[in-house]
Amino acid sequence: MNEYITQIEKCVALHPYAMILREKDMDRQDYRELARHIQVMCRKASVKMFVHSDISAAKYADCGNVHFSMEHFKQMCEEQADVIKRLDCVSVSCHSMEEAVNAVRAGADQIVLGTIFETQCKPGKMGAGLSFLKEVCRAAHTVNPTVKVFAIGGIKPDNIKKVLEASADGGCMMSWFMQHN
């Protein structure tokens, strides 16, 4: 765990726009503690942190930013819309035009759209490409001009310029950040 924390410290020191803390296999209490620790680290560096899906962990970490899968976001909108509305920033993973537009209409402040390029995380799965990214950005901004759209999947320093040229607000680079520094 210490190597992991050290790598996150290195990532935060690079001052990315944000960090999404996703640890789906971690014990819930351990995740809450980790979220609190990382939130302190991120605040000091003025990096926005998102807790992944766990509202109670977000509260525990004093973090108002939560990232959801599309399925979980839909469920939260149906069952706990008041909780969603009280969050500072709601981020949603989307994999199609329909999901992106629906997420923005339902109140997402940002979407993470993928998979744009082929990635090591999902070998053999073709990326949707830059045209898809551009079309979704256009549609999302038609619904809400202030929504942020971030690309995910195979994003690296050598292709981020193309992502930005496709009208995205940025790109998520988990593998690159965790393997470099």
Residue ranges and their predicted role:
Residues 20-22, 50-52, 69, 91-93, ...:
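A cross-family glycoside hydrolase active-site/sugar-binding cleft signature
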Residues 66-79, 112-126, 154-181:
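Glycine-rich phosphate-binding active-site loops on the catalytic face of alpha/beta enzymes
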Residues 32-53, 78-96, 126-151, 157:
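Alpha-helix-loop-beta-strand connector modules within alpha/beta enzyme cores
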Residues 1-65, 75-87, 181:
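N-terminal positively charged helical leader segments and presequences
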Residues 49-64, 95-107, 138-145, 149-151, ...:
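Catalytic cores of alpha/beta
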Residues 90-122:
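Histidine/lysine/aspartate-rich catalytic loop segments that bind and position anionic ligands
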